[in-house]
Amino acid sequence: MKLNKYIDHTILKPETTQEQVEKILAEAKEYDFASVCVNPTWVALAAESLKDSDVKVCTVIGFPLGANTPAVKAFETKDAISNGADEIDVVINIGALKTGNYDLVLEDIKAVVAASGDKLVKVIIEACLLTDDEKVKGCQLSQEAGADYVKTSTGFSTGGATVADVALMRKTVGPDMGVKASGGARSYEDAIAFIEAGASRIGASSGVAIMNGAQADGDY
């Protein structure tokens, strides 16, 4: 198992500086992580920095609340891809999901999938705000809409990934869809626990610490 290729090396805090982004990019190249996940404003910088590596550029859409309209999320997606994004992590319409307005949830994800072309789409369900039934429904709708992954968390709500949520999401989507655990992996042991529960990708700001077997503090 190449643990480095499970990791989306992540820096999403709003106060992030260019110097901090450049540090993350350098680390991603050094450790050959799966991707770097940055806010849209840093996508062009990341794409330029990573162009001669196989580290992908991941960004976030409708982040962190998920409460924009489908048209806005689709525009954000197209803009991010035009700037060099390879992977799109979009926040599901959490309020619509909890209301039971599944048509809107589906339309919302489909708009991003359509705008993404052949790029990878991961749907953040924000599991910490959902009941287990809502988590299952969010995963099912993401799958129906043609997304490539479901993802546990933004890292900016009341909680991050749990092993139980990852296991439930994997059970729901089966073997052919990706599951990303984010906002909960701070150590090598955390990462392995998520992978054993069914995670195929891990979003963490602690990628270097995970690879070095150390404990990291902080989230995104």
Swiss-Prot record:
Question: Where along the sequence do coiled-coil regions lie?
Answer: none
- Subcellular location, in the record's words? Cytoplasm
In the UniProt record, the gene name given for this protein reads: deoC
Q: Please provide, in alphabetical order, the Gene Ontology terms of the cellular component aspect for this entry.
A: cytoplasm
Sorted alphabetically, which keywords does the UniProt record give? Cytoplasm, Lyase, Schiff base
Q: Which domain of life is it from?
A: Bacteria
Keyword Nucleotide-binding recorded:
no
Any one Gene Ontology MF annotation carried by this entry is: deoxyribose-phosphate aldolase activity
* Record-given protein name: Deoxyribose-phosphate aldolase
Pathway assigned to this chain's UniProt record: Carbohydrate degradation; 2-deoxy-D-ribose 1-phosphate degradation; D-glyceraldehyde 3-phosphate and acetaldehyde from 2-deoxy-alpha-D-ribose 1-phosphate: step 2/2
Which SUPFAM superfamilies does the annotation name? Aldolase (SSF51569)
Origin species = Streptococcus suis (strain 05ZYH33)
Q: Name one Pfam family in it.
A: DeoC
Q: Which reaction does it catalyse?
A: 2-deoxy-D-ribose 5-phosphate = D-glyceraldehyde 3-phosphate + acetaldehyde
Enzyme Commission (EC) number: 4.1.2.4
Family, according to the entry, reads as follows: Belongs to the DeoC/FbaB aldolase family. DeoC type 1 subfamily.
Fetch the InterPro entries from UniProt. Aldolase_TIM (IPR013785), DeoC (IPR011343), DeoC/FbaB/LacD_aldolase (IPR002915), DeoC_typeI (IPR028581)
Tell me, which GO biological process terms does this entry list? 2-deoxyribose 1-phosphate catabolic process; carbohydrate catabolic process; deoxyribonucleotide catabolic process
Q: What does this protein do?
A: Catalyzes a reversible aldol reaction between acetaldehyde and D-glyceraldehyde 3-phosphate to generate 2-deoxy-D-ribose 5-phosphate.
Known PANTHER family for this protein?
DEOXYRIBOSE-PHOSPHATE ALDOLASE
Catalytic residues (UniProt): 89 (proton donor/acceptor), 151 (schiff-base intermediate with acetaldehyde), 180 (proton donor/acceptor)
